[in-house]
Amino acid sequence: LSGVFYFCNMQVSRFLLKFILNIFPPLLFNRIVLKEISDDFLEMRVVLRRALFNMNFHKTIFGGSIFSACDPYFPTMYYHIFANKGRKLIIWLKSAEIQYLKPADSTLKLHFKITEEDILIVEEKLDKEGKVEIWHTVNAINKKEIVCAKARMQVYLRDDKQKKNLGF
C-alpha cells in the first residue's frame, strides 16, 4: 500500500489528500496551500500567500490566517504515520499558541517536521499509558527568510482501543 493513506476512514493517495486539504474552504479562502508531503509523512511544506482575502488594514497577512496555516498539519501527519504502521489512533490538536514577531508583508513558508525520535517517544508513551501529548513548533518565514511568526502546537494522541477508558 505504498503511497496510499487514509483520510476520514477512506483510503486515499497522497495526491488526493493534498488536493482535499487544498480545497478545504478555511484553507482555500485564506490562500493556504499544502505544497509538499514527504513519502513517510514526516514532513509537510505549506505556503500562505498574501492576498485580498487575508490582508489586514496594514496590507499585511491577518494573524488569524497565519494561525490557520499552522492548525491541521501535525495531527494529519501523525494520523498517517501511525496508519501506515497499522495503528489506529484518535488525534486532536489540543492546544496552540502563536507569537507574531514581524508583520507578514509577503508570502510565508511553513515547514512542518516530525522526527523519528518524536515517533519513538509517542510509541513508548502510547504503549505504557495509552495516550500522549507532544508539543511541536513551526515558524512562518517570509520571502526575506525572516521569521514573522512562531507557533507551538500540542498534539493529543490516544490509542483507539482505549477510548472508553481514557479521558481527554
Predicted feature residues:
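Hydrophobic beta-strand-centered segment that forms part of the acyl-chain substrate-binding groove
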Residues: 77-116
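Alpha-helical membrane-targeting segments
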Residues: 2-29, 51-53
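Short, charged, low-hydrophobicity "junction" segments
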Residues: 15-21, 46-53, 82-95
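Short structured motifs
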Residues: 29-34, 94-100, 121-123
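Catalytic strand-loop segment that frames the active site of acyl-thioester-processing enzymes
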Residues: 29-61
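Hot-dog-fold acyl-thioester-processing enzymes
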Residues: 47, 53-76, 88
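Hydrophobic residues positioned within well-ordered beta-strands of beta-sheet architectures
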Residues: 46, 94-96, 110, 134-136, ...
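HotDog/MaoC-like acyl-thioester-processing domains
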Residues: 104-105, 115-168
